[in-house]
């Protein structure tokens, strides 16, 4: 879906709309640790999370860990993966390292990072549409392929919840998802289109 409707009353540059279109379709591609079918299933779970009875009840609780139950899932993804998706989409401010480590123990560190990054990328694009009163995009078609499950070199324990690149010249926000570079690229593209514009971030005057 190209952002044609808001362009009639709000000036949106081509880099922004083109980035949304490109990134959205690539979310449906086979990832490093999840297949295209699994990634699109995860995207369906992101939207389902907002009408999930368990998520709604947890949001009203003093602590989400006080509420037990099953998510209203719409996929056959692993239970822990669904929990990651729903909680990250609806209540990210109350996630804990202890909880994250349990999920990682179940699905693996790299799959955790890829899935979390996918949720964040989709959340930005969906929220952008909601803020402009636009219908949400149709989920992309799952693309074929098999995950290569290759862990990149140069990553390790830097004191975060997950392994990251040990290159200290990068800001934490720039290396948060570096354990899965291909999916991290999608996040970087969104950040640059919406906010930093890459090298232009250092310029004191932005011509937007």
Residue ranges and their predicted role:
Residues 1-208:
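Hydrophobic alpha-helical segments
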């Amino acid at each position: 879906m190209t952002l044609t409707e808001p362009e009639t009353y709000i000036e949106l540059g081509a880099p922004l709309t083109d980035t949304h279109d490109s990134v959205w379709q690539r979310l449906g591609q086979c990832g490093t640790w999840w297949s295209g079918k699994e990634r699109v299933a995860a995207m369906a779970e992101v939207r389902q999370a907002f009408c999930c009875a368990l998520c709604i009840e947890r949001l009203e609780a003093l602590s989400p860990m006080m509420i037990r139950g099953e998510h209203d899932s719409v996929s056959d993804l692993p239970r822990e993966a669904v929990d990651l998706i729903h909680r990250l989409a609806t209540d990210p401010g109350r996630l804990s390292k202890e909880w994250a480590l349990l999920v990682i123990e179940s699905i693996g560190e790299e799959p955790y990072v890829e899935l979390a990054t996918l949720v964040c990328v989709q959340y930005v694009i969906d929220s952008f549409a909601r803020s402009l009163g636009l219908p949400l995009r149709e989920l992309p078609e799952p693309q074929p392929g098999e995950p290569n499950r290759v862990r990149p070199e140069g990553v390790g324990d830097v004191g975060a919840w997950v392994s990251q690149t040990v290159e200290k010249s990068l800001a934490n926000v720039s290396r948060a998802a570096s354990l899965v570079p291909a999916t991290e690229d999608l996040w970087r593209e969104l950040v640059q289109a919406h906010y930093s514009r890459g090298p232009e971030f250092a310029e004191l005057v932005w011509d937007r």
